[in-house]
């Protein structure tokens, strides 16, 4: 990797949520979170701090090699297939 713990801590600080679920995460519990490539390596992404986000373990394992947008689209399909309705499109905000 082309970054280290200090780089990651400087970017995300002491308190940070999962970039996908919004769950609060804790540096002191490494089982709570995983580093994720925003653009997966398999899709041409690089191993730099700018291509890094932190996800809760469950979200990262479910996301796998998908991009965030592909994963969100998959989640929408699952929700709809299970009989739930999305009452309005979920708009992406400026903050994420």
Report residues per predicted region.
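Short, charged surface segments at domain edges that flank catalytic/cofactor-binding sites
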Residues: 1-20
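Structural motif detector for alpha-helix initiation sites
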Residues: 3-5, 35, 49, 68
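Generic anion/oxyanion-binding catalytic loop in active/binding sites
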Residues: 7, 41, 60
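Conserved short hydrophobic patches within well-ordered secondary structure
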Residues: 20-21, 75
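Histidine-centered nuclease catalytic patch
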Residues: 22-54, 63
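Short Cys/His-centered divalent metal-binding micro-motifs
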Residues: 27, 52-74, 79
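Short Fe-S-cluster ligation motifs
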Residues: 46-62, 81-96
């Amino acid at each position: 990797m082309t970054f280290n713990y200090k780089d990651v801590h400087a970017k995300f600080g002491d308190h940070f949520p999962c970039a996908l679920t919004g769950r609060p995460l804790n540096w002191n519990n490494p089982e709570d979170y995983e580093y994720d490539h925003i653009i997966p390596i398999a899709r041409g992404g690089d191993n730099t701090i700018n291509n890094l986000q932190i996800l809760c373990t469950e979200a990262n394992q479910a996301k796998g090699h998908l991009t965030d947008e592909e994963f969100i689209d998959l989640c929408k399909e699952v929700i709809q297939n299970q009989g739930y309705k999305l009452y309005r499109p979920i708009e992406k905000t400026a903050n994420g």
